Amino acid sequence: MKIVVLGAGAWGTALAMSAAAHAACHEVTLWARDAQQAQAMQAKRQNQRYLPGLAFPPGLHVASGDMGALAADADLVVVGTPMAALRGMLERLDGCAAPIAWLCKGFEADTGLMAHEVCAQVAPRLHSGVFSGPSFAQEVATAQPTAMVAASPRATVRDALVQAFHGPALRVYASEDIVGVEVGGAVKNVLAIATGLCDGLQLGMNARAALITRGLAEMTRLGLALGARPETFMGLSGLGDLVLTATGDLSRNRRVGLLLAEGRTLAQAVESLGHVAEGVYSARTVVQRARAVGVEMPIAECVVALLDGELRAAEAVARLMEREPTVERH
């Protein structure tokens, strides 16, 4: 099976390493936009920028240059770029015959669209889906046990992802609910900023548990309003990804909350990360999309107010705690 991973960031690199490591029959190519970066990775057999010290398996080749030619010869194309770059990548891949899956999590900032909606706009002929779930790149690259979801309305896409990545260290489940999987992946990043703030302010484990639980309710309400299945949010791409991102020390979005709690500005927090924290860029869009369908998301709204500088950390906590009493809704 010929697998092409487009984008040599931490996550694209980790999945390319995973596919090459567990199946000798796979031909895996990791494509980097920068030719010098590609040459350095191929020569040194590691991604020193994002996953330093982790050696590439023998079956992994690194390339740059003509992305279209690589995709045209592939059995599966995986797009490992951030959400902001997805539209341009899909436009370049329009007409590709191979199944295509993206890894990004979020809503497109300018349009409020989910990834599959962007694809329907710019490349409707593609057989496409999303590969998502509770997974840190570092752990996937070091073959620590992980479970993910391959979601697409097309069985060919789901089957290709299972064939490419299911192995001893990575268990892949299939789902038809691409809406639910994408909503879960987008909203959990926003909620992780809130739990990072909670932990940074040392509000305690009770507060963290409340944020995760009520955050899951917000995620579910938005997903159902957009056409998702309720059971998806109890699965890997919902509850699973939320728990990991909200509590894990490798979570960039949680780290943003921790830095804000220290008194850093948003610009300082983002600069110190060195990687993309999708929750920062998708928070406003999540809230806008929720308002458009009449869904209340008080935690996400507080995160946006905090990121915009309209609330201080202590004020955000007070706003949530002083809301009118209500029945518990999911």
Swiss-Prot record:
Its main location: cytoplasm. Transmembrane segments: none annotated. Pathway: Membrane lipid metabolism; glycerophospholipid metabolism. NADPH binds at residues 11, 33, 105, 137, 252, 276, 278. GO terms for molecular function: glycerol-3-phosphate dehydrogenase [NAD(P)+] activity; NAD binding. Keywords: Cytoplasm, Lipid biosynthesis, Lipid metabolism, NAD, NADP, Nucleotide-binding, Oxidoreductase, Phospholipid biosynthesis, Phospholipid metabolism. It is an enzyme of class 1 (oxidoreductase). This is Glycerol-3-phosphate dehydrogenase [NAD(P)+]. It comes from Acidovorax sp. (strain JS42). The lineage of its organism: Bacteria, Pseudomonadati, Pseudomonadota, Betaproteobacteria, Burkholderiales. The gene is gpsA.
